[in-house]
Amino acid sequence: MEGQWGRWRLAAAAAASSSGDQIAAAWAVVRARAVAPVLQFAVWACMAMSVMLVLEVAYMSLVSLVAVKLLRRVPERRYKWEPITTGSGGVGGGDGEDEEAATGGREAAAFPMVLVQIPMYNEKEVYKLSIGAACALTWPPDRIIIQVLDDSTDPAIKDLVELECKDWARKEINIKYEIRDNRKGYKAGALKKGMEHIYTQQCDFVAIFDADFQPESDFLLKTIPFLVHNPKIGLVQTRWEFVNYDVCLMTRIQKMSLDYHFKVEQESGSSMHSFFGFNGTAGVWRVSAINEAGGWKDRTTVEDMDLAVRASLKGWQFLYVGDIRVKSELPSTFKAYRHQQHRWTCGAANLFRKMATEIAKNKGVSVWKKLHLLYSFFFVRRVVAPILTFLFYCVVIPLSVMVPEVSIPVWGMVYIPTAITIMNAIRNPGSIHLMPFWILFENVMAMHRMRAALTGLLETMNVNQWVVTEKVGDHVKDKLEVPLLEPLKPTDCVERIYIPELMVAFYLLVCASYDLVLGAKHYYLYIYLQAFAFIALGFGFAGTSTPCS
């Protein structure tokens, strides 16, 4: 009996082994004939996009370094800049008597009329900061109008903002509190409505600050002269400075990315093309440039970039001044940052879809400028970059460990990303120690950016979804005598779990484990690290948050 049972076990084992061999053989055939060709095509597509991206990054880095560091092509050398001088010889922006001239002397008429717009939406944490900073700007009081555009839906917050405006009005500040019956067009709608008031028709320039931005008192004295003395300049953009960058690791990484954006992208665009995307705040527009471009439009969630592209097609030049910095707040919660990045990426891709034909057919600009707009500004930076990062580093490379027939060139997998990282590190020398975290975090965020870019390109139903970036007021909440916020309630643990991140993490863990046990490509160390990054963010271990209930 035992001998018969032994023969049955051997037969079953042989059958199982035979079945396993058949399955393995079948998978090998399918893999070689169907999976491998598709994956190899994806590899070469990613290689092509990688070359596009590294050349673009190298070009921008070289231009920004040579133009600013070596040739010293600073704004004051490229364009005429002189302090605004009154008829009697007084100079706006100086000390003593000169400062008196700038703040309302007899020669105030020498100063152009300036409108300062502050759009806000339920900004209970930071509204006092922006309003106070705007009201403290050094400029003749009869030559400036502060316009608070309050789209708040919370009646209590609206009352607080209106009360703050009345307090400044009692101090003889020319401040207007404006509200709308609806939020049509969101920020673009508010800015457009603000420009429709009769009193704005006397204004030559308009400075725009989001609710968490705090310009220095001499902001207008430094920026307006560029516009006054250079009639072809339609926009002066200044640099953002972050007051809460040290709150957590996520804000430090954000600072790295945005510092690179300003030092490289904006600087190179300003130096070589007199064009870049308006950042939506901390900038001064010539009103005639806005009007000639067709005003604010709400067709996308990047109304600032939309206006900039249209104004550029009309021949207006833009100037970025990196020496002028405006304090602002970074989103310190992962949820807020995800929403912000989705809005920026989706809106830019959607604007590309809407304006590509218009740019190509425009007869008022050169072929070189059309190429720069369509290829560099939109296609490579707003489409290729987000799609490539996630597709190649989080999908194709991990999957390739299971398909030995697929080969990935070392130059595309190692040399190009290393070159991009080095170029980023050169412009962020103080943050080199954060580079590994920056790489892993950006790869996770690339999942959301790719989805947002595809949403914008395909124009799905959520393409114009607008979620205002949450302001926490990290840098002021400990200094307030009376807290601006009620005590935060504990967060439901479920709300801190992000399923998409965890699904990608599971996929990466499977690929890494396969490579460790059965594979021969030895990518598992990188894949494991990237999987742990997805796990950390998937469970909400990024940014600031309240304890779980």
Curated annotation (Swiss-Prot):
Q: Which residues are involved in binding substrate? A: 210, 212
Q: Per its UniProt record, what Gene3D superfamilies does this chain match?
A: Spore Coat Polysaccharide Biosynthesis Protein SpsA, Chain A
Gene Ontology biological process: cell wall organization
Bilayer disposition of the protein: Multi-pass membrane protein
The UniProt record lists the EC number as 2.4.1.32
Write down the PANTHER family for this protein, in alphabetical order: GLUCOMANNAN 4-BETA-MANNOSYLTRANSFERASE 4-RELATED, GLUCOMANNAN 4-BETA-MANNOSYLTRANSFERASE 9
Catalytic-site annotation from UniProt:
151, 304
Task: Report if keyword Nuclease is assigned.
Answer: no
Where does it reside? Golgi apparatus membrane
Q: Which GO terms describe its molecular function?
A: glucomannan 4-beta-mannosyltransferase activity; mannan synthase activity
Family named by the database record: Belongs to the glycosyltransferase 2 family. Plant cellulose synthase-like A subfamily.
Q: Where are the transmembrane segments?
A: 35-55, 383-403, 406-426, 497-517, 523-543
Q: Which is one Gene Ontology cellular component term of this protein?
A: Golgi membrane
Q: What catalytic reaction does the record list? A: GDP-mannose + (glucomannan)n = GDP + (glucomannan)n+1
Q: What is this protein called?
A: Probable glucomannan 4-beta-mannosyltransferase 4
What's this chain's function? Probable mannan synthase which consists of a 4-beta-mannosyltransferase activity on mannan using GDP-mannose. The beta-1,4-mannan product is the backbone for galactomannan synthesis by galactomannan galactosyltransferase. Galactomannan is a noncellulosic polysaccharides of plant cell wall.
